[in-house]
Structures are given as C-alpha cells and as structure tokens.
Amino acid sequence: MCHKKADTGDQFGKWQSSPHAKAYEVLATPEAKAAGAKVGVAEPQKSGKCLKCHSTAYNFTEEVKADVTKVLVEDGVSCESCHGPGKNYKSKAIMEDQKKCIEGGMIYPATTSCTQCHNEQSPTWKADRYTTKDGKKVGFDVEQAAAKIAHPNPKAQK
C-alpha cells in the first residue's frame, strides 16, 4: 500500500495517530458518555446521533458497503469520509495523476466537508476552540484544523 511508505508521505500512519482514527474509540470514554447523556444518548458507540460523525462506515449506503468491505464502524473517521470511496481511483496509475483521481471520484475536501461534523450541533462544540489570525475566537477554523491532519505526498502529482 503506497499510503504506508515514508517516501510518499505515510498518510496511513498519520491518520492512524490522528483524532479521526480514534473517533469511534473516544465514544467509549466517560466524557463521551456524559456528553451523550446531555442529548439523550445512553450508548454513544451504538447511537446514530454520534456515529454519523464518529464513523465513516456508519454513513455508507448498502451499495457502497458492498464495494468497501474493509471499512468498519470501529475504524472511526477514515479516508473515505473526506476523500470519497476509492474504488475507482485507488490504482497507482490513477493516483499518480490528479486529474484522473478526480475523474475517478477522489474528493479534495473543502470547508463544507469538515463542517458537516465540526459544528454547533456537536455536544462537545466549543465556540472559542480556535483563535484566527486576526485574533477572533471561533469554534472551527479550517486552516488550522487542516494543518493538524495534513498528510501530503511529497512526490508531486502530475
């Protein structure tokens, strides 16, 4: 798998150590259970209210699930959540060509991808979590958040 190689950026390793990879696990913590209780959820790891943002696989349609057999609810927020199912762009020949990737369904996430979950509806939302460059306190800043999960390939695409 190319996404595990250091010379191409070790995207898998970066994801594995990220909060996204641990998004499902965190639902078992006392903090998550307390947050869930505030919105009427007794078991966060079993509730769609929580899983819709804490697990990519939870959101797959049956059609997509048939194509993506290796993605589990327990995987947390995985690649497909931000980049779309990789079935049609996962080959090396396509991955090396950005235009072909996009034609195959690869998504290069925009702010709206992030704010589907990072928003005021989250029970752990903090309106002052980030400080913008101009000193304003905001609940989410895509530039800072993206920097925390950046996983570029040092080998530039065509």
PLM region descriptions:
Residues 1-75, 80, 86-109, 128-158:
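Sequence context of c-type cytochrome heme-c attachment sites
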Residues 106-121:
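Repeat-solenoid scaffold signature
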